[in-house]
């Protein structure tokens, strides 16, 4: 009765023995016991693999960002892992070879802080939490490939983080340097630039970051700046907001470095600018706080040093006791420390041209810098281009195009070797040194004779020592362990000391997706065959908060691992993640007083009629709103308690139905009951069908279970076939997973109506129920499996995916096609195989890239060929 994808010789798991295994009654139940159903099926699946094994199918690598083992999964974890589990179940039903692993991002400050506070080892604390969280995933009914499990604090894993560091060192991409670094005074460790927010606070502790001069280890991510920026264009399945954040962070600008000679000094001051033509209107030079000239003068000028230390003065400028010569006009220019100039931009020095830049204008006004209110650019060059002619007023330059003026000035300065064309990047090298214990040891030793020497690969891993307690912050605890520090120089065999800083934990998480594919490999981080056949990750799911840190570092590592021959990802431009899903947050109901918006504990609130008031003061009104969950807001949800109350199936369905994947989920426990009522309705439909079958004679049953060609039966058959097509599209689109449930509710109502009016053939009703149960099985595994068994099947509900007889073309694999606009390929799209040219054009116009490139343009002509879409616009 149910037409399904064939098993192609794959072995379908039999579950006939489950009838004896399950403990509850199979008679009609108006109220199914969801908790009992879930527990029995989860227990059964511990020893019975629920899916069809298909090692020869097309691969589908589905990965959710692995968690820090804090000891407790929160509702945000439940949401992201539910999404990845649903997709993995769907693609397994489609016959794919699915990779759906899980591991632990286990190094980091929380474990070390907990160890200090509780007087225990960081290792014991971490592994105990991993044990707890694995048990919690069981309650959530998430099916991970636990045979691929990794933990970054395991020496078998961090050995390969050290190996990759050494490969970077040998390639000149890992180096040690003196640097002014970001210092977190609370966690007492260095932070990378990416770990300091726009307000100058630490990403983890929230403390105001200080500056220190330390010798630190860096990874030369800047060497990959162009690749990291340009290859964002090849990621059509990444959210635009994430790509925009990475573009801005990399911050490539093309401009010029111009040298300004210092008066009464042989040195020059190098300035970066994208508008060299404004040099004639420059009134001052502005320097960043950590520019070498500012730091040099602060050593000689106590007032300047105090100015830089005093946070209340940092928004004010300070004039240095030196001047620069304008290389075009010859004018002497005052030099200032200016707070709006960033260390990370260009050379940390900019030209101050108040009539061309608002920030320059405001700074000049605050610091009483004299400048002309109108442009006096009238200077231009002789035909020989060697000397400056007389000054003219600006009207004489009105006919000179800006580009021509820029070219004249640049040519003049280049001839005098005072200017050069450069690309500037906001992205700086990645500082990875951390003054903490619980991290990957940096595999270097320091020798008085040889300097910094790499540990031989044969001696990896450099293991962390066993410590029962960690006592100190501020300097690496490893620096206090003399027996661990003392070693022999691998080069001269003389006495040496180990590097006592550990690596930023983002190093470990920048390549873990490779290790999942070959987690038992003792020779390499990942075998070339495994990486090249199973990478990239097809669907990567995690929070948008990782847009810059983790995702940028992972792209860097992925490209580097290709460069050292660990994978062949040229086809994908060595990008690790094909599709990125940034799921929305979960917000909880928050109670605040109307008068002063004080956050309340729900226990302080009472409901009177339709309004809420303080229990302690019934006249004080309370307002309700949904806000980000946190302990301080008393609006969190214990996912395990909730699952134990309602059952994992109901919670999974509620999470998916309540909001689109990228939308904010407003957690409302009252709405969970609606999901429960829907599943109960399916349960009753199944039992009504079974009851009707039970009353039939054998001959009647044989006839009635055959789908017949009458109007009502054909209508229901058309509805369930359309439902298959819709579900397939929703699962593969991912962002519309919530519509699987809403469409399933509609089909449930149609089936219930068919059972009531008694005008639909019972065989058609059974087929529609089988389709319904199969299509919701990725979301609602235990309940669907139970219904499938009740419908008389002894194979797994996951044995195959049904095919729609209405629109078989919808089940075909989508194709990736480049879109060319006015002769240039602008983007690529993944789309279903469509034959009608208008449908194809409409599909292109509805994509994000289509809207970006075509929203304000009229398509004059379109040419659709087999492998390219070509558009001509006005």
From Swiss-Prot:
This is Putative leucine--tRNA ligase, mitochondrial. GO terms for biological process: Group I intron splicing; leucyl-tRNA aminoacylation; mitochondrial translation. Residues 1-21 form a transit peptide. One of its GO terms (molecular function) is aminoacyl-tRNA deacylase activity. Belongs to the class-I aminoacyl-tRNA synthetase family. Its main location: mitochondrion. It comes from the Eukaryota. The keyword Transit peptide applies.
């Amino acid at each position: 009765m149910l037409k399904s994808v064939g098993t192609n010789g794959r072995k379908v798991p039999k579950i006939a023995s489950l009838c004896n295994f399950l403990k509850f009654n199979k008679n009609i139940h108006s109220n199914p016991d969801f908790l009992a159903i879930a527990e029995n099926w989860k227990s059964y699946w511990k020893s019975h693999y629920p899916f069809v094994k298909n090692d020869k199918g097309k691969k589908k690598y589905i990965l959710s960002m692995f968690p820090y083992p804090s000891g407790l999964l929160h509702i945000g974890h439940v949401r992201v892992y539910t999404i990845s589990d649903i997709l993995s179940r769907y693609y397994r039903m489609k016959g794919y070879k699915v990779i759906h692993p899980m591991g632990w991002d286990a190094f980091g400050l929380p474990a070390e802080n907990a160890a200090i506070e509780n007087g225990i080892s960081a290792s014991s604390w971490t592994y105990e939490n991993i044990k707890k969280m694995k048990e919690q995933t069981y309650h959530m009914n998430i099916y991970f490939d636990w045979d691929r499990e990794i933990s970054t604090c395991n020496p078998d894993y961090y050995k390969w983080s050290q190996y990759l560091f050494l490969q970077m060192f040998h390639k000149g991409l890992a180096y040690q340097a003196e640097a002014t670094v970001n210092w977190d005074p609370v966690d007492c460790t260095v932070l990378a630039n990416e770990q300091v927010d726009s307000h100058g606070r630490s990403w983890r502790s929230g403390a105001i970051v200080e500056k220190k001069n330390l010798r630190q280890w860096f990874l030369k991510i800047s060497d990959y700046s162009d690749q990291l920026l340009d290859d964002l264009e090849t990621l059509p399945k990444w959210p635009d907001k994430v790509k925009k954040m990475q573009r801005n962070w990399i911050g490539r600008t093309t401009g010029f470095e111009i040298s300004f000679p210092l008066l009464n000094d042989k040195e020059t001051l190098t300035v970066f600018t994208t508008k060299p033509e404004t040099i004639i209107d420059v009134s001052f030079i502005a320097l960043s706080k950590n520019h070498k000239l500012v730091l040099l003068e602060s050593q000689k000028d106590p007032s300047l040093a105090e100015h830089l230390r005093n946070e209340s003065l940092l928004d004010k400028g300070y004039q240095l006791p030196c001047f620069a010569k304008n290389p075009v006009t010859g004018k002497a220019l005052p030099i200032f420390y200016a707070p709006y100039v960033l260390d990370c931009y260009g050379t940390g020095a900019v030209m101050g041209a108040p009539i061309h830049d608002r920030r320059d204008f405001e700074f000049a006004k605050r610091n009483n810098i004299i400048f002309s209110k109108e442009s006096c650019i009238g200077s231009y060059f002789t035909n020989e281009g060697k000397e400056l002619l007389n000054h003219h007023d600006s009207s004489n330059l009105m006919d000179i195009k800006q580009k021509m003026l820029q070219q004249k000035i640049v040519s003049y300065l280049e001839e005098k070797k005072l200017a050069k064309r450069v690309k500037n990047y906001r992205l700086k090298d990645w500082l990875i040194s951390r003054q903490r214990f619980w991290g990957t040891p940096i595999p270097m030793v320091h020798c008085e004779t040889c300097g910094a020497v790499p540990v031989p690969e044969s001696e990896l891993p450099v293991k962390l020592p066993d410590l029962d307690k960690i006592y100190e912050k501020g300097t690496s605890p490893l620096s206090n362990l003399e027996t661990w520090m003392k070693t022999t120089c691998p080069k001269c065999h003389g006495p040496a000391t180990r590097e006592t800083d550990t690596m930023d934990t983002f190093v470990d998480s920048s390549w873990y997706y490779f290790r999942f594919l070959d987690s038992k490999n003792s020779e390499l981080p990942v075998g070339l065959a495994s990486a090249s056949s199973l990478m990239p990750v097809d669907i990567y799911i995690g929070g948008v908060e990782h847009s810059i840190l983790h995702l940028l570092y992972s792209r860097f590592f992925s490209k580097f691992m290709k460069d050292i021959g660990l994978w062949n990802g040229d086809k994908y431009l060595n990008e690790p993640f094909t599709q990125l899903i940034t799921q929305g947050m979960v917000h909880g109901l928050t109670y605040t007083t109307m008068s002063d918006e004080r956050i309340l504990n729900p226990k302080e609130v009472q409901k009177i009629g339709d309004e809420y008031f303080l229990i302690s003061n019934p006249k004080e009104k309370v307002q309700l709103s949904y806000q980000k969950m946190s302990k301080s807001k008393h609006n969190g949800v214990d996912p395990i308690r909730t699952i134990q109350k309602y059952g994992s199936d109901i919670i999974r369905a509620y999470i998916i139905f309540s909001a689109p994947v990228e939308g904010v989920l407003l957690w409302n426990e009252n709405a969970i009951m609606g999901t429960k009522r829907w599943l109960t309705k399916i349960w009753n439909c199944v039992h009504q069908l079974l009851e009707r079958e039970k009353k039939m004679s054998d001959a009647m049953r044989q006839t009635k279970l055959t789908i017949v060609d009458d109007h009502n039966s054909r209508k229901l058959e058309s509805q369930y076939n359309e439902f298959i097509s819709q579900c397939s599209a929703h699962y593969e689109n991912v962002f519309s997973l919530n519509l699987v449930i809403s469409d399933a509710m509609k089909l449930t109502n149609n089936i219930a109506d068919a059972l009531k009016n008694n005008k639909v053939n019972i065989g058609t009703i059974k087929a529609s129920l089988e389709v319904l149960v199969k299509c919701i099985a990725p979301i609602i595994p235990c309940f669907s499996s139970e219904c499938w068994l009740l419908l008389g099947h002894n194979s797994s509900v996951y044995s195959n995916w049904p095919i729609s007889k209405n629109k078989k073309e919808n089940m075909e694999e989508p194709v990736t096609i480049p879109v060319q606009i006015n002769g240039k390929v602008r983007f690529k799209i993944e789309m279903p195989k469509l034959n009608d040219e208008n449908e194809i054009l409409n599909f292109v116009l509805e994509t994000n890239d289509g809207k970006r490139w075509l929203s304000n343009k009229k398509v004059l002509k379109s040419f659709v060929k087999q492998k390219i879409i070509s558009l001509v616009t006005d």
